[in-house]
Swiss-Prot record:
Single Gene Ontology BP annotation: coenzyme A biosynthetic process
Site feature (Transition state stabilizer) residues: H17
EC class of the enzyme, as a word: transferase
Encoding gene, per UniProt annotation: coaD
InterPro entries linked to this entry: Cyt_trans-like, PPAT, Rossmann-like_a/b/a_fold
Protein name according to UniProt: Phosphopantetheine adenylyltransferase
Subcellular location: Cytoplasm
Lineage: Bacteria, Bacillati, Actinomycetota, Actinomycetes, Bifidobacteriales
Pfam families: CTP_transf_like (PF01467)
EC number(s) on file: 2.7.7.3
Amino acid sequence: MTIAVCPGSFDPVTNGHIDVITRCCRLFDEVHVVVAVNAMKKPLFTETERVDIIKHALADSGMTNYVVAWTDGLITDYCRKVDSPVIVKGLRQNGDYEAELGMALVNRHLAYVETMFLPANPVLEHISSSVVKDVARHGGDITGMVPDYVVPLLEKALR
């Protein structure tokens, strides 16, 4: 059984994230969606809230071969713990490749974990958590950028 790890800050989870996760679920026996706690970031939602939001967002995906968890440690340590040989990341055309390649090389060095890149769905490529928060913060419509469940949660968190 091949387990893949799909990490991110997911603050908030976007429809782009959900797309990558569901595609990943079609490719692997089991997918661990891991909320990675980054001490350098000030998230809107706690790690527990983000886990719950992702679980709710994936509930209607039709996928059942996923686990949602969080870690404040290295993703490679999490990979070792669950015996996963691969990390899967989505890539947009906005410079993600350079940043993600650097992390992929570090992860391979630390734990011999390979990183696979899935190109973003072109329809969702412009969406990022940062863009969603900025649009919502200024009263813009984020419908279609995030799962419907996330819209009121994000609006409340930004008040």
